Every structure is written in C-alpha cells, then in structure tokens.
UniProtKB/Swiss-Prot annotation:
GO biological process: proteolysis
Cofactor (UniProt): Mn(2+)
Binding site for Mn(2+) 2: K270, D275, D293, E354
Record gene name: pepA
Taxon lineage: Bacteria, Pseudomonadati, Pseudomonadota, Gammaproteobacteria, Enterobacterales
Name of the protein in its database record: Probable cytosol aminopeptidase
Compartments where located: Cytoplasm
Binding site for Mn(2+) 1: D275, D352, E354
Enzyme Commission (EC) number: 3.4.11.1, 3.4.11.10
Catalytic residues of the enzyme: K282, R356
Amino acid sequence: MKFSIADKSIKQTKDILLILGIFYKDCYQKTLKYISDENKKNIIQVVKNIKIKDNIGSTYFISNTNKVGSNPILLIMLGSKVNINSRIYKKLIINTISSIKNIKYKKSIFFLLNLNFNNSNLYWKIRRSIEYIYESLYEFNNFKSKTKSYKIYMKEIMFYIHDENEIKQANIAISHSVSISKGIIITKNLGNMPSNFCDPHYLSHQSYILKDKYSEKISVEIMDHKKIKNIGMNAYLHVSKGSSKNPYLSIIKYNENKFNGKSPIILIGKGLTFDSGGISIKPSNNMDEMKFDMCGAAAVLGVMHAISELNLNLYVIGILACCENMVDSSSYKPGDIIKTLSGKTVEVINTDAEGRLVLCDVITYVKRFNPRIVIDIATLTGACVIALGHHYTGLISNCDELSENILNASNITEDLAWRLPLNKKFSKQLKSRFADISNISDRSGSAITAGCFLYEFAKEYKWAHLDIAGTAWKSGVYKQATGRPVSLLTQLLINYGDKKI
C-alpha cells in the first residue's frame, strides 16, 4: 500500500474513490465543502435515507454516476459526537479497510483528517491512520496449507490536505508511520513463527537481511557459542546448556562509521526462541506461547529496520541475545552457582528465571562501547502481567530523565508503559547464602526484583528495562505477536534524533 498527499485537482477524477466521514444532522456540511457539487448531491440524497445517529463505523458505498464531477464514494458514519477518541477512530479505520477490500478501485482520497480526536494535530492523525491501516491488513498465514486469502485492489491512499502549509508535516508523518509499521510487521512475523523454524540461528541471522538492505549504514557481527564462551559470558551459556541449538549473539551497528568514537544508544533484546523453564519446568498449559519469549529481540530488529529506513541521525547498537532454555541431562540446575561476565556470582534458585541471566552478561558486555544509554527489552516476568495486565509495559530505570523520555514516547504513541520503583529494599530480597546474588526472590514484587537483578549489572549506565511479558503478544482466539514496543522505541529515537514533532 502506498500513501501520499492528494493533489487538489485529482479529486475530480472519476476512477478515484473518495473516503469521507458523515456526522449526524448538519455536522457533515464541513466535510462536504471540499468535494464537488455533484458528489455533494449524491451524498445528501443517500444520507436522507440513513439513520446515522448511533451507527458509528458503519459504511455505505455510493457508486459513480458517470456525471461530470462524480466519484465513487465510501461514507463512514461518525454518529453525533464531533469529538471522538482514538479507540473510535481505530474502529473507523478498521471498518474502512474492511469495506475497501470489497471495492475494486486502485486509488482513494482520504478525507477523515478533518475529524477532531484526542486534540491530535495533522501529523498524528495521519500517523495513526497509516498505523491502523497496516494493523488492519496484517495477516500471518505462512504455515497454513490452505488459507482464505483476499485480494485488496486498493494500491494507494492519498490524504486530502486543505492547508498547503501543512504538506511538509504530512509527508513527515507518512515517512514515520510507514517505517514504524514495517518494523512492527518484521517483529510480528518473527514472533509468530514456531520455534522449530525460528531457532537461535535463524533469529540471530535475520540481522544480515538488514545489513544487505542498508549496507552503508549497518554492520553486523554474530558471535557463536565459541566466541561467547571465550569472552566469558557464562550465565548466557548456562541457560542454553540443555538445548541442542547453539546460542548466538547478534550485534547490529547503525551509523557506526558516521559517529566514530561517539557513545551509542544500545538496545538489548531477549531472544529466547523457546523457554520450557528448564529443570524448573513450566506448566503445560499455554506453554506453546513460550515461542514468544524472543519478542524482545524481534522488537530490537524491528526498531533497527525502522530507524534505518528513516535515516535517523543517531548511533545505535541493537543486540539480539538468542538461545533456548530446554530440559536435558546437561541443563543447568537449581542450586548451581555461575560466575557472570562481570565477575559476580549468581546462585540459581529457579531455572525459569533465565532471561535475566542472559541479559546480565550482555549488559556487562556492552560496557566496551561506552554507551550513552542502555535499554533492555524482555518478556521477563509473569509478575509484570499480574501487576500491569496486557495494556502497559513495565519500566524500571536508574535515570529519571530517561524514564521521562520513554514515558513521553509511550504516551504520544499509545504504546503505553508504566514506571515501577527501583529501590534497595527490593534488592535485599535477592540476597544469597552461597553467592553474591540469587537469580530470583520470593514472589512479592517479583517484577521489580527482576529489574533490580539487572540493575546490579547496569549501575555504570543510564539504563532502562522494559518488561514486555504482558504486551508482546495476545493470547486466546486472537493469539499473535503485537509488535510492541517498536512504536515506543522508534519514537524515542526519533525524539533523540532531533526530529521530534
């Protein structure tokens, strides 16, 4: 799907579908002033026979009358409220796309930008529209032998901008939303793949696809089991001991040559392509969803795609920490003590608290890059789901400024996050009788204590931890990866790159 700005003269072309919203009573007159008299007549004639007061989101198609100034029209019923929220706007977009699938026109002009929702400016109206459109069109049927596929005839949606002074802002919105949406699709596709296809080797080596596409901006290094061992990342290796699949660490550098010697922003993604829990095995119920335990790494890859396409003026390193946590005679065990890359020792109380063991070594490893900021993204704790549900990503940080920047990006993108406390009182729960620290505490505040564990290895950085256990995928009938928090993180980097809107 292509998105562009409509030339004012193009709306008279009869082969172009007009998409516009109609309010109850006289409110629709404002929308109609931008279209031809013939189209106004056609709409008014149809609206007289429609009860639209409480029928928000319903669509009506008006075919072309072949008269001069006549277009095919898709009417979207907006009800009686002039101000709508983003939830209703999303419903309007979804219903619009559903209707477009059955209409055989290749181009359309989109007039819904005149709506007032959440006091959004033009940039956010366009960005929300495109992101909702991509979400509506997304399907993952890669492994079905037979699918009910559909053909969408629409190839281009043009946004009608009546103020020429806003065209530059509109084009920026298109660029941002398309790039972010493509990054989200990459993240979703990887998350939705089964672990017998998307194993540590497959996931880590997806970074080469990015390198091939953006060879001037991207460099990639992939460490295998031997390199990881030689560096001394013992905690990382212990997690993978029970799997026949070797671990890999993929390091993706964006704009390294341009910012030679400068400090990068570092994103670390947990990439457990399957997590059985190890010896502390998980319950069988919903264990299939543990293929989603790599969504942190998938999100980092999606963000790196998005910023490469946007050509942000930043130095960013994305790291995919890929391995499996399986049950075997060689698996690491409760009671084991592991010396991490930092030199600290960890007593393993529960092998299902494996993500923090992988991440602690990677957080230590990135010290060599002298990072400006370090953010880790992980499906880390079920406790975060209990605390924040499936709406908010958990945020823990040692830096108020970084937290505020993340929360600002989360609020404006509606990819929501909520800050949890970082406090020594929680850290005391991680004390070990036999090692420097335990890998898990008691159940109280365990989403926070998981963050406190990671902080033990991140004290030298401006650091933030995003726990996406509740937001990375949906369960039940609509089970699939969500692509979060690609939108949040890309917006954060857009803001850091001085392209803030």
